[in-house]
């Protein structure tokens, strides 16, 4: 901090939407006091994108998919000065703000993953009924009946765990529900990835093209952080 301003230096990957021409303001989280208690070192502040020292370095494709000008980018902040009044809630409350978003954000991605898993299962079933191998539809080969059944079971398990996590977040709060949130963050994306893998097998060579959208669906697997 310098007087009534904060001077920001750093580099940030995965800055969401900053290349979109409609993006005029960024919310920046950074370390404001390294000597404070562990969870009070970070702060969040509003930074207008036209502030001197703000540089969009590059767009970041994910698994080769390029969503520019949307998606994510790398941003460099070089002696960026912003008024102290732009600070959210107060100095040292950045982690607190972030935690209020992470739980709901993660369960939101799990809901999306379940929806994509349903759509992927539909594509797989349609493909299995329309494609033939050894003189009969692939769906008639026993291994695919087992895979379809397993996919349905896993989707329902993921849906129920997501609903339980959401119920607990509403009734007892995110802190008490943190175990359920963590569990569904692991379960839903892994369920999706398993179903996508089977769907790619069902589509043959077409499964690895962009024609069926299966590769893009894989991007949800690591949404909002890794699951390990």
Kindly give the residue locations of the regions a language model identified.
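Flexible, small-/acidic-enriched active-site or ligand-binding loops
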Residues: 52-79
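Structural alpha/beta core scaffold segments of enzyme domains
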Residues: 1-2
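Short, charged, solvent-exposed linker or helix-capping segments at domain edges/interfaces
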Residues: 39, 55-58, 84-91
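Short alpha-helix boundary/capping segments
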Residues: 18-21, 37, 65-69, 102, ...
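A short, hydrophobic C-terminal helix/tail in secreted or cell-surface proteins
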Residues: 224-228
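A short core secondary-structure module
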Residues: 5, 9-57
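Alpha-helical interface subdomain recognition
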Residues: 5-6, 74-80, 90-95, 99-223
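Short, solvent-exposed loop/turn segments at the edges of secondary structure
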Residues: 21-23, 40, 70-72, 213, ...
């Amino acid at each position: 901090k310098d007087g009534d301003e904060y001077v920001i230096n750093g580099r940030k990957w995965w800055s969401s939407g900053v290349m979109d021409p409609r993006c005029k303001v960024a919310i920046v989280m950074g370390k404001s006091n390294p000597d404070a208690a562990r969870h009070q070192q970070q702060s969040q502040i509003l930074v207008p994108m036209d502030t001197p020292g703000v540089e969009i370095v590059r767009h970041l494709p994910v698994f080769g998919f390029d969503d520019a000008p949307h998606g994510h980018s790398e941003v460099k902040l070089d002696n960026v000065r912003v008024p102290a009044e732009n600070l959210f809630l107060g100095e040292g409350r950045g982690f607190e703000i972030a935690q209020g978003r992470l739980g709901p954000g993660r369960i939101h991605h799990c809901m999306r993953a379940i929806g994509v898993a349903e759509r992927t299962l539909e594509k797989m079933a349609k493909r299995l009924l329309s494609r033939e191998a050894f003189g009969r539809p692939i769906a008639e080969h026993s291994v695919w009946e087992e895979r379809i059944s397993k996919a349905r079971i896993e989707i329902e398990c993921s849906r129920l765990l997501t609903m339980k996590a959401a119920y607990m977040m509403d009734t007892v709060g995110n802190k008490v529900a943190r175990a359920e949130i963590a569990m569904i963050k692991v379960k839903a994306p892994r369920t999706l990835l398993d179903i996508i893998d089977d769907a790619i097998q069902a589509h043959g060579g077409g499964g690895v093209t962009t024609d069926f959208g299966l590769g893009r669906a894989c991007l949800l697997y690591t949404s909002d952080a890794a699951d390990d």
